[in-house]
Swiss-Prot record:
It comes from the Eukaryota. Its main location: plastid. Belongs to the PsbI family. It is a single-pass membrane protein. This is Photosystem II reaction center protein I. PANTHER family: PHOTOSYSTEM II REACTION CENTER PROTEIN I. One of its GO terms (cellular component) is photosystem II reaction center. The keyword Zinc does not apply. It is found in: Plastid, Chloroplast thylakoid membrane. The chain crosses the membrane at residues 4-24. One of the components of the core complex of photosystem II (PSII), required for its stability and/or assembly. PSII is a light-driven water:plastoquinone oxidoreductase that uses light energy to abstract electrons from H(2)O, generating O(2) and a proton gradient subsequently used for ATP formation. It consists of a core antenna complex that captures photons, and an electron transfer chain that converts photonic excitation into a charge separation. Disulfide bonds: none annotated. PSII is composed of 1 copy each of membrane proteins PsbA, PsbB, PsbC, PsbD, PsbE, PsbF, PsbH, PsbI, PsbJ, PsbK, PsbL, PsbM, PsbT, PsbY, PsbZ, Psb30/Ycf12, at least 3 peripheral proteins of the oxygen-evolving complex and a large number of cofactors. It forms dimeric complexes.
Length: 38
């Protein structure tokens, strides 16, 4: 049960980070030079 909870939390954190980085990389006012991949 504890392992399943860690797996679920890691998946949620992963998708949240993908959403946040995708939003920031598509926002020219926050990232005009697109240097988020460095």
């Amino acid at each position: 049960m504890f392992t399943l909870k860690i797996f679920v939390y890691s998946c949620v954190a992963f998708f949240c980070s993908l959403f946040i980085f995708g939003f920031l990389s598509n926002d020219p006012s926050r990232n005009p030079n697109r240097k988020d991949l460095e």
